[in-house]
Amino acid sequence: MALVSAVPLDSRLCLCRTLFGLTHELKAIRRTIPNLGMCRGGKSIAPSMSMSSTTFVSSEDGVPRRIGGHHSNLWDDDSIDSLSTSYEAPSYRERADRLIGEVKDMFHLISVEDGVSTSPLNDLHHRLWMVDSVERLGIDRHFKNETNAALDHVYSYWTEKGIGRGRESGATDLNSTALGLRTLRLHGYMVSSHVLDHFKNEKGQFACSAIQTDGEIRDVLNLFRASLIAFPGEKIMEEAEMFSTMFLKDALQKIPPSGLSQEIEYLLEFGWHTNLPRMETRMYIDVFGEDTTFETPYLIRERLLELAKLEFNIFHSLVKRELQSLSRWWKDYGFPEITFSRHRHVEYYTLAACIANDPKHSAFRLGFAKICHMVTILDDIYDTFGTMEELELLTAAFKRWDPSSIECLPDYMKGVYMAVYDNINETAREAQKIQGWDIVSYARKSWEALFDAHMQEARWISSGYLPTFEEYLENGKVSFGSRLTTLEPMLTLGFPLSPRILQEIDFPSNFNELICAILRLRGDTQCYKADMARGEEASSVSCYMKDHPGITEEDAVNQINALVNNLTKELNWELLRPDSGVPISYKKFYFDIWRVFHYGYKYRDGFSVASIEIKNLVTRTVVETVPL
């Protein structure tokens, strides 16, 4: 359905006037809890949350409580213990290391002016193909220097009309130009999308023959991939995406099932923003080698594919140990007894593994899984199960930052409190080794902001108040929890994050604001109906409808989706703009975590219903190995 025009949502003007410097801050209501040292043990706490249109149960203390009806943990100890460790033998690592050396030699062969593997008629495309291949096969971390040298060479021949296949090609080439535009942008080179104007016909349209050969299809496939790396206001990229999408869908109706058709289907479905690196690697391993439109020597393809398979499988041995550690943590804090909540620690770990499969990033993967799990438990406590008085006690206990505060809490909250308390301190110790400064105070402020935001939403539920869109989104950017799930794991990575860099990528930077806003809006469009059924009236959809009387629910969702699309282009720019002073590699981890959540909301609320797409993701990326 077409977007209504009566109530346009412009991303720069309508995002609550908060993302772009126009402030109207929401003042959170706070109630002071008197002397937490005087706990009122045994007191029956009356429910004060709205019970309309939701399910509730009577707990052991006789208090009716709201529940979400979420399915249980899908991955027990037997599932984890059954994971393969057959590739942890030293011989596999030794073979992988030899292959890494051979691939480095192959990069060297294409770096000489007229080597065995290249010529002045194809050297630019060959370099781009090598860089693209190692990235999609998930082995690029071994070839950073080689990648930089290859792209520097390509960029030195870049023109306002793009490039040809080689430095001495007589004409520009769509495939090479599109692949170059995409790859150079993602690595921080300033390249204009106007190079694509030179591939239009006299009518100003992209045009290809009706025959649709494999070579031509791959040209357009790379055009599609490039079009997704769009910045605000780039009409040519919108045109390229529209044309290439239609072309590729038409091609799928004509070509037989093959690696090419599988690749097209995958990229049309996941694009870039929901395309997780390890997930793409698993697909690309299956189809790599079938592309013969670029005549790369068989030996190069063979070595790249073998290395990719080995690295994919070797990682599985590490996965098993990390998941066993995560499962012990989950049980040690009594999480299995919290039966009313979602338990998605294995799924969160998988998502982390899909964006960070370097063995040295174990702390990142486990930290991300733990924090996401705790944030999810807290979300279910604040949104459904907890009473208002319990929530006030929990919030105040966190702000006191004293383990003795748990004596005032209901039993089901005590383990959660200690898990958060211990996790912050453990992460701080790990981070201090890398960052050289104590992050406890910094992390506590982030957690306190989350608790305040949850309390605000709990009060809205309790009172039946429906806020304005502006009020809701300003609070919702915090209550989603994406800042927390990003911040602490990031601090355990191997690169230093100074206060100056944190200001550029963490709160209150525009980069962080965009991430938080997009995730809140995207999550709401997938969750708002289920949330309303549980008695949670406030969502970006319902609040937008309140602000615009007469608009239909469908049109409100369409307007929000359009806003998300515009904000996503702004996020692309914030990630890749060359004047930020922060290396793209630093921002890329933040961005990839955003992609993780974006993927989770692609089809539904995948964190509440994890038994479909995300279950398949776990199976494909961390359970199954690939045949050598």
Curated annotation (Swiss-Prot):
Binding-site list for Mg(2+) 1: 379, 383
Binding annotation for Mg(2+) 3: 531
UniProt binding sites for Mg(2+) 2: 379, 383
Free-text remark on how the cofactor is bound: Binds 3 Mg(2+) or Mn(2+) ions per subunit.
Record's GO cellular component terms: chloroplast
Any single biological process term in GO: green leaf volatile biosynthetic process
Location in or out of the cell: Plastid, Chloroplast
Assigned EC number: 4.2.3.-
Gene3D superfamilies, per database record: Farnesyl Diphosphate Synthase, Terpene synthase, N-terminal domain
Cofactor(s) annotated in UniProt: Mg(2+); Mn(2+)
Keywords: Chloroplast, Lyase, Magnesium, Metal-binding, Plastid, Transit peptide
Top EC class of this enzyme: lyase
Annotated GO MF terms: magnesium ion binding; terpene synthase activity
Major localisation: plastid
Pathway: Terpene metabolism; oleoresin biosynthesis; Secondary metabolite biosynthesis; terpenoid biosynthesis
Placement of sequence motif DDXXD motif: 379-383
Pfam families: Terpene_synth, Terpene_synth_C
Entry-linked InterPro entries: Isoprenoid_synthase_dom_sf (IPR008949), Terpene_cyclase-like_1_C (IPR034741), Terpene_cyclase_plant_C1 (IPR044814), Terpene_synth_N (IPR001906), Terpene_synth_N_sf (IPR036965), Terpene_synthase-like (IPR050148), Terpene_synthase_metal-bd (IPR005630), Terpenoid_cyclase/PrenylTrfase (IPR008930)
Functional description taken from the UniProt entry: Monoterpene synthase (TPS) involved in the biosynthesis of monoterpene natural products included in conifer oleoresin secretions and volatile emissions; these compounds contribute to biotic and abiotic stress defense against herbivores and pathogens.
Similarity remark: Belongs to the terpene synthase family. Tpsd subfamily.
Domain comment quoted from the record: The Asp-Asp-Xaa-Xaa-Asp/Glu (DDXXD/E) motif is important for the catalytic activity, presumably through binding to Mg(2+).
PANTHER family from the UniProt entry: (E,E)-GERANYLLINALOOL SYNTHASE (PTHR31739:SF25), ENT-COPALYL DIPHOSPHATE SYNTHASE, CHLOROPLASTIC (PTHR31739)
Identification of the protein by name: Monoterpene synthase like 1, chloroplastic
Species of provenance: Pinus banksiana (Jack pine)
Gene (UniProt): TPS-mono1
